[in-house]
A protein has these predicted regions:
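Active-site bordering "gate/hinge" segments
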Residues: 1-205
Length: 205
């Protein structure tokens, strides 16, 4: 909803911009409840997470998910039903599949040009190999197609969240490991909101 709201603001659709922020706000409350912060969560640590989730996390999350899903679908209908919005975005900002590959375009921008790539599926990390989700690809190659990808991914994220809540395991939140030897290398690739993010790390002496 952050992206949807900002996109609407940039093109002058401020009514939906404000509605998107309203829909998003309960998510911010939830993240503050679960992590202690609205934005910079500080939960990830080497070997696990900083603290366990509260015991009632499912009871707190599910009603918010239900509400957000309903309101998001209504916002999507408003976007898809706005002919002036479509006329401004369709046919604008063309990136052909060939250009997308030539310029190494990634993420939703690539998928809006018909390039079927997604690190969550192609190089599974975290628990993505344990959930079902659709890689959202559009063939329009324009801003409208990229907008549709973002919209579809917002709905898909809600479906993923439901699965993760059902499959959340118990147990310790930090892995136990001995002293890590020096000069060991780790490489990761994850699907971020704007495309793949790669990290390279090496242990010190």
């Amino acid at each position: 909803m952050l992206w949807v709201g900002l996109a609407c603001h940039f093109i002058g659709f401020d009514t939906l911009f404000m509605q998107s922020w309203r829909i998003r706000e309960p998510v911010m409350w939830l993240t503050e409840y679960l992590t202690g912060n609205r934005k910079t969560y500080g939960m990830n640590k080497v070997g696990g997470v900083a603290r366990d989730l509260p015991s009632d996390y499912k009871e707190r999350i599910l009603p918010v998910v239900e509400k957000i899903e309903t309101e998001t679908l209504a916002a999507v209908d408003a976007i898809l039903g706005d002919s002036s919005l479509q006329s401004r975005l369709a046919g604008t900002g063309i990136i052909t599949p060939e250009d997308a590959r030539a310029f190494c375009v990634l993420g939703p921008t690539a998928r809006g040009s018909g390039v079927d790539i997604d690190a969550r599926r192609d190089h599974p990390f975290a628990a993505y190999d344990e959930v079902e989700f659709e890689v959202c690809v559009e063939q329009g190659c324009d801003i409208w197609a990229r907008t549709l990808v973002r919209i579809r991914e917002t709905i898909e994220a809600i479906k993923i969240l439901r699965q993760l809540l059902d499959k959340m395991p118990g147990g310790p939140v930090m892995a136990e490991f001995d002293e890590i030897p020096p000069y060991k290398v780790g490489v990761s690739s994850v699907e971020a909101p704007r495309g793949e993010v790669h990290h390279y790390a090496m242990t010190g002496p």
